[in-house]
Amino acid sequence: MITSSLSIMELLKNKLFEFPALVDGLKNKDYNFLELLEAWMKETEAILVNHKFSEGAIIAGYRSRIIAPLFADTQKRSARKRQLQVASEVLFEIQNTVFLVINPIEIKIDEARNLLIHLLSITKQSEAIKYNESIDFQSFISQIWKLFSTHEQLKPSSIKILTLVSQIDALRIMAEEINLSEWK
């Protein structure tokens, strides 16, 4: 089964949107910062691992660096302070690891979206397909996609789109971009 690039990007972007609050927690010396950071890292790691991204292991490696002071023999500083020090040193790398996963996905999705917007514009202007309320929205989108994938001049672009995103993602992008009132 092909995994939705849109879904992966949304999940990881949502995790990144939570990141500023973690940084603020460190800055404000929030007592729960380490627990919140660990929970965030575990959730992000799970998303990455579940979608077969090796960066999940990198996040786990950063977690191990933060946990390591708990097992150090030195007693010069408390383990918690050493953990906070390590966490502050790796925060950017943690965020950047997730960003580096999202960025190429986002580039492909944006390219596919631009191609789809172009194809939709051409199709709408040609009036080759019109929307009427007797068919449901999903059928309407499927009808447009069928035109894209069978029309001699549009087919190369639809093939290019499928090299960037799955067909399900392409249909979802189309659903986001279509304003039905313009298709009547």
Predicted feature descriptions by range:
Residues 159-184:
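Extended, charged low-complexity segments
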Residues 110-157:
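Charged/polar low-complexity intrinsically disordered segments, enriched in acidic residues
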Residues 4-8, 134, 166-167:
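Alpha-helix initiation/capping motif
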